């Protein structure tokens, strides 16, 4: 059952990532990997909220919710591999400031998003 839930969650998360990324690129252009950055920040925020909510607020078989939402949906939604290749492409194109900014913003804002998510999750 867990494998099926992870499969379904990953599919939904991947579709959500595709939609959010494309919307951000449509609105803001592709000069900077803003789509991946927004996806990873919102994914980190949701991870914090759902982690606390599932562990502290739900009763019953929390492993099913963890499989569907944390491992599945958020695993399919967020992407370290896209962050990595987009940063590499910035470096290869000589956009060193953009590459450094992408690394700094991704790390700092994703950690901040997870922290904020935990705080929000504890208030639910």
From Swiss-Prot:
A GO molecular function held by the record: metal ion binding
Membrane topology per record: Multi-pass membrane protein
Signal peptide residue numbers: none
Membrane-spanning segments: 3-23, 34-54, 68-88, 100-120
Regulation: Na(+) is not transported, but it plays an essential structural role and its presence is essential for fluoride channel function.
GO biological process entries: cellular detoxification of fluoride
Catalytic activity annotation: fluoride(in) = fluoride(out)
Subcellular locations according to the entry: Cell inner membrane
Disulfide-bond pairs as recorded: none
Family stated for the protein in its record: Belongs to the fluoride channel Fluc/FEX (TC 1.A.43) family.
Name of protein: Fluoride-specific ion channel FluC
Gene expressing this chain: fluC
